[in-house]
Every structure is written in C-alpha cells, then in structure tokens.
A protein has these predicted regions:
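Acidic/His/Gly-enriched intrinsically disordered linker/tail segments
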Residues: 1-82
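Gly-Asp-aromatic-enriched flexible segments
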Residues: 77-209
Length: 209
C-alpha cells in the first residue's frame, strides 16, 4: 500500500497503478472505518490546505492495508465494502473458567468480532442460536443448507494475519490452533451478502476439563 500512496505519482503512469489507486480510494470512501476522514482529506487537498494520507491515517495504516488486501481478494460484482468492513472497536478478552461470552452475528455482514481472545490449545464450547437467510427463499440455522452455504464459520486474527477459515456450525467445540481473536460470519459468497437476512446469537465458554 505504501507504493500506492507515495508522493510524486501522476495520472497516466500505467493502468495497473491507476486501478490500484482507484481501488484504495473506493475502499476509503465507502468503508465506515475511514470514510469521514477520507472526505475531509479530499476537501483539504483540493483547497490547498496542509494535509496528507500519512497525516490522516497514520494510526490506521496497518488496518487499512489489511482491509485493502482483503478487498482485492474478494472484489466482484455485488461486493459491498460497507457490509464487509472490519470491527476494530470491539475489545477482545480471554475467558476465565466461569466466564460466558455472547454476541450477535449478522448474516448480512462479513467477518464480525466475537470479543474472544483465544489461548493457543484451549478448547471452547459454542452454540449459535437462531435462523438466517442467505437468499429470500432459503432460511437455515448455523449449520447451513447442507452444501456449505449459510454455515457459521470462524477465523483467527493475530497481528493482522488471518488463519484459514474453519467451520463452526450450530453447536460444538473448537480448539484454538493459535493465540488470536475469533471472528465469525455466515458463509456466503462475498458478492451475495446484500440479500441476506437474520442473525444468530453465538454463545462461547471455555470447555470444562
């Protein structure tokens, strides 16, 4: 991303560079995490005021780079940046033996924070209660439709690095393969989230030994 925002670039250098800059601007303009500051940045630059990308997003540079890479991976007709933005505000915590954690997981969204900071090797019991729709006709629980769509899935986030996604389903036990934050979502094509409806309430606790 540093190459894209470097000073001294000019329009018309190459279609690849133009496309990369367009993609970053589109992300910043439509992602709720960055949109307000991006608008201010644009106004300041057009009116000759002192401002820069580095000044505007110094504290969010790693987050933007992370979301930009995922945006490029998943972009397609129907992709919604606003639905796929990451929740950087929810604070994750480790669970004590007696603690319980629950969160709402929306079908019409990308990866969502659970608030769980997992310990490597620790087992957790989970249950996802509720129904959601992955299209106007198909309502399922967190186990999905039998062929993988609509299934509750998870991923570990650590240091802006993602693990491979894994299935959760409606109920079971998961062992953390690494230390990291647990993010979850309703499995559906990234370009098809707009017509999803409903939500599941996810309950988590440490498994008893």
């Amino acid at each position: 991303m540093n190459k894209i925002v470097a000073e001294g670039q000019i329009t018309g250098d190459s279609w690849q560079s133009y496309a990369s800059r367009w993609a970053l601007c589109y992300l910043l303009a439509h992602n709720p995490n960055y949109a307000a500051r991006f608008k201010t940045l644009g106004v300041n630059l057009m009116t000759g005021q002192t401002d820069s990308f580095e000044t505007a997003y110094a504290e969010q540079a790693e987050q933007i780079s992370f979301e930009y890479d995922l945006f490029l991976q998943n972009l397609g007709n129907g992709y919604r940046v606003d639905l796929c933005c990451w929740d950087w505000q929810t604070k994750a915590k480790e669970l004590a033996a007696e603690d319980r954690l629950d969160c709402i997981v929306k079908a019409k969204a990308g990866w969502q924070a659970t608030g769980l900071q997992a310990e490597a090797g620790q087992a957790y019991d989970f249950a996802g209660l509720g129904q959601w729709k992955i299209d106007p006709q198909t309502e399922v629980n967190a186990d999905g439709d039998g062929v993988g769509q609509g299934t509750l899935v998870g991923v570990w986030l650590s240091g802006y690095q993602l693990s491979k996604p894994f299935e959760l389903g409606a109920q079971g036990k998961i062992v953390a393969t690494q230390k990291g934050q647990l993010f979850v979502r309703c499995r559906d094509a990234w370009t098809n989230l707009e017509d999803n409806q409903g939500q599941v309430r996810l309950h988590l606790r440490k498994s008893k030994k």
